């Protein structure tokens, strides 16, 4: 391990204290919530619902041609 000076050690301690205080949630709880949020947004999301892309005037309709 390399030699650290006092300011580096203080920064490391502050970072570790911050990480320790951070509230974590179980993945078994958050992953189903995330999947439900994604599934609820499918009707409104043009990236997940291709029918919405048909009404978007900014989507390219054909391939690019070089003049």
From Swiss-Prot:
Gene Ontology molecular function, alphabetical: G-protein beta-subunit binding
Species of provenance: Homo sapiens (Human)
Classification of source organism: Eukaryota, Metazoa, Chordata, Craniata, Vertebrata
Membrane topology, from the record: Lipid-anchor
Function field: Guanine nucleotide-binding proteins (G proteins) are involved as a modulator or transducer in various transmembrane signaling systems. The beta and gamma chains are required for the GTPase activity, for replacement of GDP by GTP, and for G protein-effector interaction.
GO cellular component: dendrite; heterotrimeric G-protein complex; plasma membrane; synapse
Superkingdom classification of source: Eukaryota
Family membership: Belongs to the G protein gamma family.
Full protein name: Guanine nucleotide-binding protein G(I)/G(S)/G(O) subunit gamma-13
Keywords: Cell membrane, Lipoprotein, Membrane, Methylation, Prenylation, Transducer
Alphabetical list of InterPro entries matching this protein: G-protein_gamma-like_dom, GGL_sf, GNG13, Gprotein-gamma
